């Protein structure tokens, strides 16, 4: 009994030892199954989301194919002759203006939009959405007001008047050049006075051109005529500019003086930049040296390479005249246009077919405060010469002659890094013809008649003659030949030349015929 009891207890302990690891395995399996279940749940949700998106997209395509193929013919072959050709009807929008109490209202009526098929997808053509013009004008006024407020906050607090000096004279391109400068000055948002100095005396032709601007203008004339050489012309233009500065001194015009030559091109940023000058400033000028002969300006590749090598050895020069600054934006020198490549090839006379070169320092690149020219001005700097005692015959070449210390010049335009105007001289031949003021009076004659347009002043048709008479005119004389004496026109046939034909006398015709240049012309017509 004891042995059986011991054996039974041993078996029970052994069974318990085998059951304990199974319980541990069951706990581990339970946790693993929970993680797998969560993973499959997440994967199932992700697949459902993907199927939902793809199904929505597929449903849109199916809906598009089912309900829009009949109207758009997406998969119709472009060259099938059995299909009818459909034309696109372009519908216009009817606009009716109804005057109201507050303004004009626009009533737009649009027709049904059509479709155009390009590739696989159809394009719906919708009517153009015409906005209400009253609302558009209000929007423009709001934008203009905002820009004005921004300029008042971030721009110049107090703007100065601009005094533009332009030397000119009557020539073929005067209307062309003055019109360009005039429209540039008309766009200036500041008060402006335009002083025009004319060589050869003030003329009505120049006065009519500058009167169209609507600006405050001062027209001054000098007795000297413009010479026909570029060197003498530049000297006379200096004299004309000094005369304009004397007008500023006498009238005590308060503002910024700039030298706007009639053939120069100005950027609108220039007029904003010169507002920053205190006494005497300078800007960079782009030099456009040109030649009327294109063959001379087109150089071979070898010559260009040689010139590039020479420029690299000496110094690379750009066609710019203006101030040179250091890293601290302080004036240390000047950029001058290099005239060495044009040595011996520059124009001497105004109508020469050659490159026109500028002076060492052009006046158009300088601006100054008009108070420097006054006799008595507050806080006038000491490094400025007295303009009243300046002798014009001393050789005033540039505005730097007005200063005692040229280092006090203020560089403008990001210290000369911005080119704000361009210097160019383009003139016609001295003997070129042009109508005064470019006004065609009397009208020009017709050179080539337009199609389906009769010639003016058509001469009347001649009176009908009798059947047995045919008139032939010689100048103002008319000779009538009876019809019996007329010879029918025969078609000449080529005949062989023979020696006998040369010696045979030709039969003389008793009928007298009169030929003249006018009669031949009538017969040809």
Swiss-Prot record:
EC identifiers of the protein: 2.4.2.24
Parts of the chain on the Cytoplasmic side: 1-35
SUPFAM superfamilies per record: Nucleotide-diphospho-sugar transferases (SSF53448)
Topology Lumenal: residue spans: 57-525
Keyword Cell wall biogenesis/degradation: yes
GO cellular component, one term: trans-Golgi network
Disruption phenotype: Reduced xylan content in cell wall. Reduced amount and altered composition of seed coat mucilage. Plants missing both MUCI70 and IRX14 exhibit a severe reduction in both xylan- and pectin-related sugars in total seed mucilage extracts.
Keyword presence, Transferase: yes
Region annotation Disordered: where it falls in the sequence: 452-525
Main location: Golgi
UniProt tissue specificity: Expressed in developing interfascicular fibers and xylem cells in stems and developing secondary xylem in roots.
Annotated glycosylation sites: 102, 204, 326
Topology in membrane: Single-pass type II membrane protein
InterPro entries the record matches: Glyco_trans_43, Nucleotide-diphossugar_trans
Superkingdom: Eukaryota
Catalytic activity: [(1->4)-beta-D-xylan](n) + UDP-alpha-D-xylose = [(1->4)-beta-D-xylan](n+1) + UDP + H(+)
Bilayer-crossing regions: 36-56
Family: Belongs to the glycosyltransferase 43 family.
PANTHER family attached to this UniProt entry: BETA-1,4-XYLOSYLTRANSFERASE IRX14, GALACTOSYLGALACTOSYLXYLOSYLPROTEIN 3-BETA-GLUCURONOSYLTRANSFERASE BETA-1,3-GLUCURONYLTRANSFERASE
Protein name, as recorded: Beta-1,4-xylosyltransferase IRX14
Lineage: Eukaryota, Viridiplantae, Streptophyta, Embryophyta, Tracheophyta
Gene: IRX14
């Amino acid at each position: 009994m004891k042995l059986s009891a011991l054996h039974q207890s041993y078996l029970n302990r052994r069974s318990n030892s085998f059951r304990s690891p199974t319980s541990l395995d069951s706990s581990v399996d339970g946790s693993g199954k929970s993680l797998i279940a969560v993973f499959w749940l997440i994967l199932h949700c992700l697949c459902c989301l993907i199927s939902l998106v793809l199904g929505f997209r597929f449903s849109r395509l199916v809906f598009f194919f089912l309900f829009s193929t009949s109207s758009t013919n997406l998969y119709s072959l472009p060259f099938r002759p059995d299909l009818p050709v459909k034309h696109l009807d372009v519908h216009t929008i009817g606009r009716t203006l109804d005057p109201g109490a507050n303004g004009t209202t626009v009533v737009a009526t649009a027709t049904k939009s059509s479709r155009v098929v390009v590739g696989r997808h159809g394009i719906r053509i919708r009517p153009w959405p015409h906005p209400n013009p009253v609302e558009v004008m209000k929007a423009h006024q709001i934008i203009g007001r905002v820009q004005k407020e921004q300029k008042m906050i971030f721009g110049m607090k107090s703007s100065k008047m601009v005094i533009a000096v332009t030397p000119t004279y009557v020539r073929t391109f005067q209307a062309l050049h003055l019109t360009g400068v005039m429209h540039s000055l008309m766009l200036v948002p500041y008060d402006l006075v335009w002083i025009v100095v004319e060589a050869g005396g003030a003329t009505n032709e120049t006065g009519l051109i500058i009167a169209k601007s609507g600006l405050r203008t001062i027209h001054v004339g000098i007795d000297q005529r413009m010479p026909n050489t570029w060197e003498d012309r530049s000297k006379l233009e200096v004299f004309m500019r000094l005369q304009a500065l004397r007008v500023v001194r006498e009238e005590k015009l308060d503002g910024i003086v700039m030298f706007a030559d009639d053939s120069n091109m100005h950027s609108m940023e220039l007029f904003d930049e010169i507002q920053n000058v205190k006494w005497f400033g300078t800007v960079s000028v782009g030099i456009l040296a040109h030649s009327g002969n294109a063959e001379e300006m087109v150089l071979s590749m070898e010559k260009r390479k040689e010139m590039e090598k020479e420029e690299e050895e000496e110094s690379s020069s750009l066609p710019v005249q203006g101030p040179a600054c250091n890293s601290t934006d302080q004036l240390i020198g000047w950029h001058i246009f290099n005239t060495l490549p044009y040595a011996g090839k520059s124009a001497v006379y105004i109508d020469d077919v050659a490159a026109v070169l500028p002076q060492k320092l052009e006046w158009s690149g300088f601006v100054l405060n008009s108070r420097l020219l006054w006799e008595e001005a507050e806080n006038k700097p000491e490094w400025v010469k007295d303009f009243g005692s300046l002798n014009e015959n001393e050789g005033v070449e540039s505005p730097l002659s007005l200063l005692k210390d040229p280092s006090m010049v203020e560089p403008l335009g990001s210290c000369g890094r911005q080119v704000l105007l361009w210097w160019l001289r383009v003139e016609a031949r001295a003997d070129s013809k042009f109508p005064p003021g470019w006004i065609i009076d009397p009208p020009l004659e017709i050179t080539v008649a337009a199609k389906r347009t009769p010639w003016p002043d058509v001469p009347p048709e001649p009176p009908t003659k009798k059947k047995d008479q045919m008139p032939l005119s010689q100048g103002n004389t008319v000779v009538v030949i009876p019809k019996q004496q007329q010879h029918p026109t025969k078609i000449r046939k080529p005949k062989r030349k023979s020696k006998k034909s040369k010696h045979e006398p030709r039969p003389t015709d008793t009928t007298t015929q009169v030929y003249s240049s006018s009669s031949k012309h009538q017969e040809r017509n």
